[in-house]
Amino acid sequence: MAPPIVLHLSSARAYAVVMAVLLVLFLLRVVGQILAATTAPSWLPPMARWYSGLMPYRYLLPTQIVFLVVMIAMVVGVDRRSSPLGTLSATAGRWIVWASYVYALGMAARSIRYALATPERRGVLIPIIFHFVLAGFLFAYGSSVL
């Protein structure tokens, strides 16, 4: 089933640019979290605001680095329309767009839970925001072949 909303851009380069912007935002989040964990500059929120604690940071950081490497390969693949990551089938693109909807919906539910919680039970907002960035990246990636 075709997703109800997809991103319609004029060229592979346009999709790659959107994906690259989202990639840079995620990279800034990873760098910000590293700085918060290691040097704690006063101009950044403290580490506790960057980190939900769902995965120990010693595993989270390498996972984020792997994501960044794969995301770079995806951007380059889409821009060049080259295999393996830039030449998806339309079926794969539809699945990825639907997955981005589910991902964003999960983060919307998490955001609502955050907003309704008492301040001492709220958790952290920064990871939620950047999960939306990742959902947007998937949305653009899947849309690039539709």
Question: Can you describe what each PLM-predicted range is?
Answer:
Residues 47-54, 89-91, 116-131:
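Non-cytosolic membrane-interface motifs at loop->transmembrane helix junctions
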Residues 25-58:
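Hydrophobic transmembrane helix segments
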Residues 94-115, 128-138:
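Hydrophobic alpha-helical membrane segments
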Residues 35-36, 69-81:
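Membrane-water interface of transmembrane alpha-helices
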Residues 79-103:
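Cytoplasmic juxtamembrane regions at transmembrane-helix boundaries
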Residues 38-42, 79-80, 108-120:
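Juxtamembrane "helix-exit" motif on the non-cytosolic side of transmembrane helices
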Residues 9-23, 90-97:
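Alpha-helical transmembrane segments and their helix-start/interface "positive-inside/aromatic belt" motifs
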Residues 22-23, 60-74, 129-146:
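Hydrophobic cores of alpha-helical transmembrane segments in multi-pass inner/ER membrane proteins
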